[in-house]
From Swiss-Prot:
Belongs to the peptidase S1 family. Snake venom subfamily. It comes from Crotalus durissus terrificus (South American rattlesnake). It is found in: Secreted. Residues 25-250 form the Peptidase S1 domain. One of its GO terms (cellular component) is secretory granule. Coiled coil: none annotated. One of its GO terms (biological process) is proteolysis. Expressed by the venom gland. This is Thrombin-like enzyme gyroxin B1.7. Keywords: Blood coagulation cascade activating toxin, Disulfide bond, Glycoprotein, Hemostasis impairing toxin, Hydrolase, Protease, Secreted, Serine protease, Signal, Toxin. Gene3D superfamilies: Trypsin-like serine proteases. Monomer.
Length: 259
């Protein structure tokens, strides 16, 4: 069963659909307080996701994280401790690859959010640039999030967790999920640990996959339970949409994603 990795508000829901709702990192450790300055928490009436700050006014996340009354928080490390530079914002505008807001298991699970007020760079807040080159298969990549650290029973931590996973050829994910009829080629990245034990999971959706220091992927979907052997997760490929993202930020809001 595949999971869209999102945490439902009030009730923690495990969605048995082919998208990772926002999940916490399985098999990871508490992130160093200085390594997740880019990490946003994205709340709506019905879900919790993650996002990535790409400049002082814009956050990139997954399309399936969309919802009403969106709040975005940056600079948070411990939910029990408030830091002086924590920032809370609302979504002033949201942009999707398709005007219908459609997305699939393998394409266009991406949403660009303009914050109502820009944030300031600080000790705990800093953007991560868009990628300039594609990642290499075999790369060790970093994932981070506030999602559940256990699966299928869910345990949500007070601090974000980080883990290292491997980038695979897309064919590995193609073979792992024959029941979903994935296309022969895809604009997603396939990443995980073949023996299992490390994975993104519930409430990590929309977070970043960072390979060799570059923001290469957005947490999209994966298996349920999470972190199973031979069941890597799929991540929206950021590089394919950089021109669209940059055009939106520049004010060309009529631009469309590449086909």
């Amino acid at each position: 069963m595949v999971l869209i990795r999102v945490l439902a508000n009030l009730l923690i829901l495990q969605l048995s659909y082919a998208q990772k709702s926002s999940e916490l990192v399985i098999g990871g450790d508490e992130c160093n307080i200085n390594e997740h300055r880019l990490l946003a928490i994205v709340y709506t009436n019905s879900s919790q996701c993650a996002g990535t700050l790409i400049n002082q006014e814009w956050v990139l996340t997954a399309a399936h994280c969309d919802g009403e009354n969106m709040d975005i928080y940056l600079g948070v490390h411990n939910e029990s401790v408030q830091y002086d530079d924590e920032e809370g914002r609302v979504a002033a505008e949201k942009f999707f690859c398709l005007s219908s807001r459609n997305y699939t298991k393998w394409d266009k699970d991406i949403m660009l959010i303009r914050l109502n007020i820009p944030v300031r760079n600080s000790t705990h807040i800093a953007p991560l640039s868009l990628p300039s080159s594609p990642p290499s298969v075999g790369s060790v990549c970093r994932v981070m999030g506030w999602g559940t650290i256990t699966s299928p029973n869910e345990t949500y931590p007070d601090v974000p967790h980080c883990a290292n996973i491997n980038l695979f050829d897309y064919e590995v994910c193609l073979a792992a999920y024959p029941e979903f009829g994935l296309p022969a080629t895809s604009r997603t990245l396939c990443a995980g640990i073949q023996q299992g034990g490390k994975d993104t999971c519930g409430s990590d959706s929309g977070g970043s996959l960072i390979c060799n220091g570059q923001f290469q992927g957005i947490v999209s979907w994966g298996d349920n339970p999470c972190a199973q052997p031979h069941k890597p997760a799929l991540y929206t490929k950021v590089l394919d949409d950089t021109e669209w993202i940059q055009s939106i930020i520049a004010g060309n809001t009529a631009v469309t994603c590449p086909p």
